[in-house]
Amino acid sequence: MTAEEVADLRLRRYNATVVSLNLLNPDLMVLRVRPDFPRHPHHPGQYCTLGLGYWEPRVAGCQEETLPAGDETKVVRRAYSLSCSIYSEPGRLMRLEENDWFEFYIVLVRENPDGRVPALTPRLFALKKGDRIQVGERVTGHYTLDPVKDGDTVIFLGTGTGEAPHNYMTWELLGRGHTGKILNVCCVRYARDLGYRDTHTALMEQFPNYTYLPLTTREPGVTRKVYIQDLIASGELEERLGGTLDPARTHVFLCGNPKMIGVPHRDRDTGAMSYPQPVGAVEVLEARGFKADVAAIKLKGNVHFEEYW
């Protein structure tokens, strides 16, 4: 494909510009993109799509890709929850009207165990400031703070970049003066994967009702692996919260690895629910009196989830 053909495809297919890329480690970044269009009203916790053409370069060290004939002019897209850096400057929460960009928290997928070649993230990590990109004009999703009332306890449980929507939700809660306790748990493999750790530490110093709990499972020196499900079952989550888990006044938000979440399967004929194995957070919480959302029957519970996979 010639340079002129690539330039023409970019002109016709892209509608946003890369404002900044903050590479937190070789496989993790915070990406900000400015759309050509005015941002439509949306809610923290929702998502939109990012897209790049197959004609774009990929970073080195990723699974080898062989494109089928004709795919080189197509655009690959994926949905990403919107993230938020929460502060615009030390001690001052961001004001939405100050920014004209979307923020995304992205991990580089170098290869897939199932053999499917990662198409988008190796191209996203090859971007530079000023490059063009496609962003979906529609921000959507049901994973929002709508059911939360002031005074409710809010618990965010996320793995990896699944904390992205929780960052945005945290910003909204603190910005509107939420009086209930807020606990934000993020489980990652290594400490270097805690991309917003400094921000959360600063929030704890500024807001007495906010607690951040980072967990690492492969960090050298960690003698005991603690997964989110274990944290709930052992009672340690309540210790960190400083109170009991009361389903009547608590909302739990789960985002990340499907094995952590453990969404139950609903039998279409009988309506019976069955939990997957290994045990996920939904099963542990429902044993404590909580009830997960069931989209198929439009049931709104107090455990909400976004399968970020």
Residue ranges and their predicted role:
Residues L82, P165-G175:
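Histidine-anchored nucleotide/phosphate-binding helix
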Residues G151, L173-I182:
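Conserved S-adenosyl-L-methionine
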Residues V185, Y190-W309:
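Reductase modules of NAD(P)H-dependent flavoproteins
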Residues C48-G51, I133-V135, V154:
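Generic structural signal for buried aliphatic residues
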Residues E137-K149:
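A short, basic/flexible loop-to-alpha-helix module at the beginning of a structural domain
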Residues T159-P165:
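Ser/Thr-glycine-rich phosphate-binding loops at phosphate-binding pockets of nucleotides
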Residues T153-I155, K181-L183, H251:
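Structural motif
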Residues A3-K128:
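Ferredoxin-reductase
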